[in-house]
Amino acid sequence: MNHGESTVIETVNAAKPNFKKEKLLNAMKYRYATKRFSEKTIPPEDFEVLLETARLAPTSFGLETWKILVIQDKTLREEMKEFGWGIKDKLDASHFVVFLARKKADITFGSDYIRHMLKDVHQVPDEVYEFYKNAYGNFSENDFKTLESERSAFDWAGKQAYIVMAHMMVVAALMGIDSCPLEGFIPKEMDRLLGEEHGLFDTEHFGIAVMAAFGYRGEDVHRNK
């Protein structure tokens, strides 16, 4: 999924949502961490809605410190099973999503990435850029200390990926699409496989934060919420 494109999002002129809260609650009751998926495939237009949901999801400071990989290649999915002790059955789902998070160098103020996001994407004027510099600097160095280490920086960037994943899962439930968030993999080995061996992302800038499977349940639910 591409990020960093200059896009105007019509929030002010967008229609106010108009649906009963019972619909949302029913979707949340219907949703569960699906263990086995059927062979049914999500229609392309429906999955596009989930990708657009990801794009519109909020992130801290609007920096979008994440990226999405949609893994549809069956051969690659088989390779992933070696380093995914808790994802094997879920790799049979209609769509399998890997959420990446940026590393410390990219989320340090003054980096090419942050400058690109603020200047090129959000097109903030110089005075707002300076405000971001002070506010984000204080946040990352003093308040949350996100830049104390490579790990703390990646964990913070990864939190943004989890926000995006959660939004996708909620909208999926509203559409009758099942999902399962996944952490059952070996990050170092999966980074090497997808990033270094297959070249799907630059491991100098990204690491895998979390994964999720989307599709339709292939099992009966035995436990009520």
Q: What are the residue ranges of the model-derived segments?
A:
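Acidic, surface-exposed loops and disordered segments
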Residues: 2-225
